[in-house]
Amino acid sequence: CAGLYNTIGNYNNFFGTASGRFNTTGCRNNFFGPSAGLCNTTGSYNNFFGSCAGCNNITGSSNNFIGQDAGLCATGGNWNNFIGSGAGLCNTTGSLNNFFGLSAGSRNTTGSNNNFFGNSAGSNNTTGSYNTFIGAYAGSSNTTGSYNTFIGLRAGLCNTTGSNNFFAGRCAGYNNTTGNYNFFAGACAGFYNTTGSHNTFIGACAGYKNTTGSNNFFVGCYAGACNTTGSHNNFFGLGAGSCNTTGSNNTFIGSNAGRNNTIGIANNFIGAYAGFCNTSGSNNNFFGPSAGTYNTTGSNNFFAGFCAGACNTTGCHNTFIGFCAGYRNTIGSNNFFAGFCAGFCNTTGTNNLFFGCNSGVGTFGLANITTESNRIIMGNCLHACAQIQVAWTAVSDIRDKCIFGSVPHGRGFLQKINPVKFAFKDRNTGCLTDIVGKYRYGFSAQEILAVEGDKPVIASNEDPDKLQLTSDYLVPVLVNAIKELSAELDALKERVASLELKS
C-alpha cells in the first residue's frame, strides 16, 4: 500500500507498509517506515523516517521527521526538523522548528521558530515561539512562553508562559512559571523563581530561593541565594546577600558582603564581609573589608575603612571614617569618628566627636573613651600642642543658664594648690612622650580634687584611671581671689590713710 493513491507526484521514495499511502501530487518526498507520511497529499520535499513519522502530514513541506511517531500529528507545518521518538508528536501547523531528542517538543501545535534539543526538551510547548531549549527536560513545561533560551539539564523546567528569559545551567530557573525578562546563568541559579521578573542571577545557586522578587542583579556563587520577594537588589561576590529574603534596594559588593541581611533595606555594603551580620539594619553604608561586620539592626550608619565599625550591632546614626575607626562600638549612637583607629575603644558612648589618628584611644594622656558620651576629642596623646588663629568663643548668655549661686573658692583655694612644671610620660614604661626638653605648666588633678572635696567641678574623677581638670574653671576662682586681694588692699589703703591723718 505504499504510495497507493499517488497520481502525479514525482521523485518520491516510499518504503514501508502504508507509507505515503494517500500522497497524490506531493513531490520529492522520502518516507521510510510503516505508515510514514501516511496522510500526505500535496506536501513536498519531506523526509519522514520511522514508524508513523509524519503520519498525518497533509500539505506540510520541507520537513524532516526522524524517529517513531516523530511529527505524527503534523498537518501543514513547514521547514520543521524533528529527530527522536515522539519528537514534535503533536505539531500541527507550527513551522521552522527544530526538535531533537526523545519527546522533544512533543506537544507543540502551532508554535514556530523553536529549537528544542534534549530528552523531553520543550515537551509541553504548544503555541510558544522563538524558544531555544537545550538539555534534557529543559523548558519541558513551557506552553505559550516565547523568546526564551534555556540551556542545561532541567533548565526552566516549570516555565509555562514566562517569556524573554535566558536560563543557562543545570536546573537554572527550574521553577519559573510566568516570570519574564530574567537572566539566570549557573547551576540552580534562580531555582525557585516563579513570577519574579527582570532579574539577573549569575553563579551557582545565585538567587536560588527567589520567588517573586524582581529587578535584582546577583553575581557570584550563592549570591542572594535565599532572596524570596526582595526587589531592586544588587549583590556581587561569593555569598553576597545570600540570606536576604525580603530586603530591597540593597547593594552588596564583595565576598559575603551583607551575607546575613534578611529584611534590611536601602543598604550599601562594599568590601569582603562588609555588613556580614546585618539582618534588619537599614539605610547603612559600609565601605571597606569587614566594615560593619557585626552590625545586626543598627541603621543609618556610615562606616568607611577596613574594619570600620566592625563590632557595631545596634548603634545608629554613626559616622566612622578610617582604618578600624569605631572598631569596638556596639550600641553607641550619634558618634562621629574620623581618623586611623579613631574611637577604637568606644563601646556604648553616644554623641561623641573624635578627630584624628587614635583620637579617644590610649593608656596615658588623653582618656581612653569607652562608655563616655557627649565628648569632643581632637588628636591623641602624642600631639604637643593645639593651635588656632582666633580664640575659642563659648556660649555664655545668662538667659541660657540656671544660676545656683556664686563660686565658693578664692584666694584660700589657690593657696592650697601648687603649679607644676611637667612633661607627659607613658605610665607603664615611665618614658617621656613629649619632645625631650619641652615642658608644660599646669596643676595636679589629684591635688585639686583633694581641695575641692566631695563635689568637684574643676577636676573630674568620672574615670578614676584618667583624672582630668578644666583649667578654664580656675578663672572664676582667680577673679574671686583678685577681688579678695583688692578688698584687702582697699582696707589697707584706708588704714594707711587713717594712720597718716593721726600722725
Set out the residue ranges of the language-model regions.
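Acidic, glycine-rich loop-and-strand cores that form catalytic or ligand-binding grooves
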Residues: G410-D426, C431
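C-terminal accessory segments
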Residues: I403-I417, Y439-V451
